[in-house]
């Protein structure tokens, strides 16, 4: 009987259609122009006109959909740096991304973000978030 249950679980797991998609919300800010041309943690040079961001733990190259919860505007950004290092903030975005999201004048915005692509080998559903909501 135990073998039968094990086989059923393996078959169900093999044909499972969905992966978990994590979403997180919090405060986002954007980089000052001072950082243009400075080296980022991911190795490249910072460019405030690109659609990139900093996240504390997600792998470099991870693509995120970021939505400003105040106006429902969204952008797609690539994780290229580490941070933010200000308590309560979840992302540092480039000024270009902040303009698209409509919060340059405010300095910060309450955003939600979700992983839309992870170029690294690490599976998306193994990444640990704080205060995550998981949907299938």
Question: What spans do the regions from the language model cover?
Answer:
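Hydrophobic helical h-region of N-terminal Sec-dependent signal peptides
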Residues: 6-11
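Secreted/periplasmic proteins
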Residues: 4-5, 20-136
């Amino acid at each position: 009987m135990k073998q039968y249950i094990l086989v059923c679980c393996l078959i169900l797991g093999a044909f499972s259609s969905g992966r978990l998609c994590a979403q997180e919300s919090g405060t986002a800010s954007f980089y000052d122009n001072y950082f243009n041309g400075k080296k980022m943690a991911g190795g490249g040079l910072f460019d405030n006109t690109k659609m990139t961001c900093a996240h504390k733990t997600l792998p470099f190259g991870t693509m995120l959909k970021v939505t400003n919860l105040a106006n429902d505007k969204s952008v797609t950004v690539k994780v290229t740096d580490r941070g933010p290092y200000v308590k309560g903030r979840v992302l540092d975005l480039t000024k270009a991304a902040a303009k698209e999201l409509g919060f340059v004048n405010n300095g910060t915005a309450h955003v939600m973000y979700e992983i839309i692509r992870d170029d690294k080998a690490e599976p998306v559903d193994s990444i640990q978030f704080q205060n995550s909501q998981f949907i299938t």
